[in-house]
Amino acid sequence: MATIGMGDIKKNIRLIIGEVPCKVIEFQHVKPGKGAAFVRMKAKSFLNGRVFEKTVHAGDKFEVPEITFKTMQYLYDDGEQYQFMDNDSYEQIGLSYEQCDDASKWFKDGIQVDMIFYKGNAISVSAPEVMELLITDTPPNFKGDTSSGSKKPATLETGAVVQVPYHVLEGDTIRVNTVDCEYLEKVK
C-alpha cells in the first residue's frame, strides 16, 4: 500500500488513521516560532461519518486506503437502511443511515450515486456534486426584498434546505452544489 507524509496532506485526500479509512476535510500547516512544523487536520471517517481532529508531525506516515467507486441507483428508504441497486448486476445493497450521513439529504428516487467500497464492502455513498432540484417551500417575497442582495431559506424536494436569492420562488427548479449546500443558479 502507498503511504503519504505530513507534506502530502491536503483537502479531500484519503488516508487510514488507526485502521479507519478517512477523508481529510480541513487542514492547516503550522510553523511555530520554536520547534518543528506540524499539520492540524480534521478527517471524516468513511465507516461512520464521524469527524475528528488529528495533529500530524514530520515523519508521521499514513497508508492510502484502496477505495473503489461504483455508480449505483438510489431506490428507497426501508425504515432501517437506504437501498441501492447495482446498475450492472441489479444486486441490491443496503447502507445504514450513519454510513450515508450528509449524502442522504440529496437522495431522490432513481438518482445515480457513487457507492464507496473498501476491502470489497460498501462503506459509504456520495451524491452527485451538482443536482437540479425543485423548491417545495420558500417564504414569499415582499416589496423591496430583491434590492437587498440577501437570501432566504428554501426547502427542496429532497428535504434539504439551501439559501436562495429572493427572485427564486416556490415551484422553481434550481441547480445546487451538494458539497457546499449552495445555490448555483435557477434552471430555465
Swiss-Prot record:
Family annotation (SUPFAM superfamilies): Nucleic acid-binding proteins (SSF50249), Translation proteins SH3-like domain (SSF50104)
Highest taxon in the source lineage: Bacteria
Statement: the UniProt record of this protein carries the keyword Protein biosynthesis: yes
Keyword Cytoplasm: yes
Gene Ontology CC annotation, any one: cytoplasm
Keyword annotations from UniProtKB, A to Z: Cytoplasm, Elongation factor, Protein biosynthesis
CDD domains named among the record's database cross-references: S1_EF-P_repeat_1, S1_EF-P_repeat_2
Biological processes, Gene Ontology terms: peptide biosynthetic process
PROSITE patterns (alphabetical): EFP
Family: Belongs to the elongation factor P family.
Name of this protein: Elongation factor P
Organism: Sulfurimonas denitrificans (strain ATCC 33889 / DSM 1251)
Lineage: Bacteria, Pseudomonadati, Campylobacterota, Epsilonproteobacteria, Campylobacterales
